[in-house]
From Swiss-Prot:
The chain crosses the membrane at residues 29-49, 62-82, 106-126, 135-155, 166-186, 209-229, 258-278, 295-315, 347-367, 372-392, 413-433. This is Divalent metal cation transporter MntH. InterPro entries: NRAMP_fam. It comes from the Bacteria. H(+)-stimulated, divalent metal cation uptake system. GO terms for biological process: iron ion transmembrane transport. It comes from Nostoc sp. (strain PCC 7120 / SAG 25.82 / UTEX 2576). GO terms for cellular component: plasma membrane. It holds the Pfam family Nramp. It is found in: Cell inner membrane. The keyword Ion transport applies. It is a multi-pass membrane protein. One of its GO terms (molecular function) is metal ion binding.
Amino acid sequence: MTPPENRPSLPEVHRSIRVPNSNSFWRKMLAYAGPGYLVSVGYIDPGNWATDIAGGSKFGYTLLTVILLSNLMAILLQSLCVRLGVATGRDLAQACRDYFSPKVSFCLWVLCEIAIAACDLAELLGSAIALQLLFVIPLIWGVCITALDVLVLLFLQHKGFRYTEALVIMLVATVGICFTAEILFSRPDMGGILLGYLPKKEILQNPEMLYIAIGILGATVMPHNLYLHSSIVQTRDWQPTTEKRWEAIKFGTIDSTFALSLALFINSAILIVSAATFHFSGNQNVAEIQDAYKLLSPLLGVSAASAIFGIALLASGQSSTLTATLAGQIVMEGFLQFRLPSWLRRLITRLLAIIPALITIILFGENSTSSLIVLSQVILSLQLPFAVIPLVMFTSNRRLMGEFVNPLWLKSLAWLVAIVIVGLNAWLLLQSLWGWLLQVPS
């Protein structure tokens, strides 16, 4: 690993938030709280909605176990991001550039940009669908309107990183409150929910169930979040001593674990509401977010249910677009040492998402959008190994991490998660290839 010579990750906000010299746990927790919520946004974005709604309406509570396992994997991987960022002062993209050859780093950068484009596509479509449902705006116009969120991001960056964190926390809280109400409206079967969290082998045996399960994995554990988190933990201005680094790792891990637990509740709630409202009323093919919106109020008998659903979807889409931009900036600067103005970076990211979205809407109609969102989540899942494996490698490398290296139990768990992710992706590819071969005329 070459000694780090380049400037810090996200230099405009690097060490911009003061950590108090206080023995108060809560004062320090408040200072460190924030990055975890920016990361949690990626776990409740519209991509999760599409996969959770499809999974709940078709298979009831069965796929709750996938949401739980995916979230536990996410908590583990995000804790490694905190460890890497605090211990080395490098984000994951910078560490990859230092460790791998230029060709390998370039390939990893391309794969990561594809993942960010897929993620942004889901967020863009989710926000556009929400605008259409709430204000009867044509989907094509909604897609174009969401590109204007670049102005919000530029304003927040000018005000300071804490303002970005505050807005995102407010939007995440909005989604959480909305789905608490939806669960109360849907009156789900608590026994069925508890059984849904138990693993079932039929998930691996049913190709359609496996496809949605891996879509949930891709929607939950997102590759760009690993790059994002390893960078934004460095916004806190802790003293560069061993003791303070351990403290930063501890509080950063608590922050992300709590935030991702909230994301687990929201993801579970989306699937539970879908299962309770659609699956058990005979509507087992509700795959479109628009259909879910239209059916919620009639089936639940609560006129506000659909509007609350739409508000939560808009909050989810808008919050996740903010973090995708930051991730794109971190990835480009880290891998290529190439910096673009944030407005230009946002515009490029948006165009990469707008073009396939508009083409799909024009060619296949507005009802194809949720299928495109689910596909984007499967693409994200296929990119995961290329971010997870380097992360586990680096945090298990004693020469790089020093005394902050993963202990044996954490290293073993991390490699197990990496193997599970690679194995599930390989299984999906084999299933898809086999299905394609069966359809080819002999």
